[in-house]
């Protein structure tokens, strides 16, 4: 197996997971083809498992902070799998665009 999943130490929502490659790479873009495939297969498996276990989950955010200027604080590639639930925020419009609040709303 090329990756493993853990609970995020500082979860954004309940059951927030991290998908982490076993080999140390700083960037998602440094993954080899087999690693890339393995990481994404585990991401999908974890999503399916969470959906099966928790009927309140209605959507997911999937995110990668790649590089210090993106907000990456742990300099080892990892993917966030963040379960979302209806009404967990008052207005989810813009999704990950909320990183830049002024860009959150767009035509």
Placement of each model-derived feature along the sequence:
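HIT superfamily nucleotide-processing domains
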Residues: 1-107
């Amino acid at each position: 197996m090329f990756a493993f999943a853990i609970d995020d130490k500082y979860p954004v929502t309940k059951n927030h997971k991290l998908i982490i490659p076993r080999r140390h790479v700083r960037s998602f873009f440094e993954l080899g083809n087999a690693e890339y495939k393995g990481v994404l297969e585990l991401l999908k498996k974890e999503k399916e498992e969470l959906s099966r276990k928790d009927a309140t989950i209605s959507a997911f955010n999937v995110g990668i902070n790649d590089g210090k200027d993106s907000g990456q604080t742990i300099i080892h590639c990892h993917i966030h799998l963040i379960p979302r639930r209806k009404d967990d925020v008052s207005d989810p419009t813009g999704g990950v665009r909320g990183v830049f609040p002024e860009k959150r709303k767009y035509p």
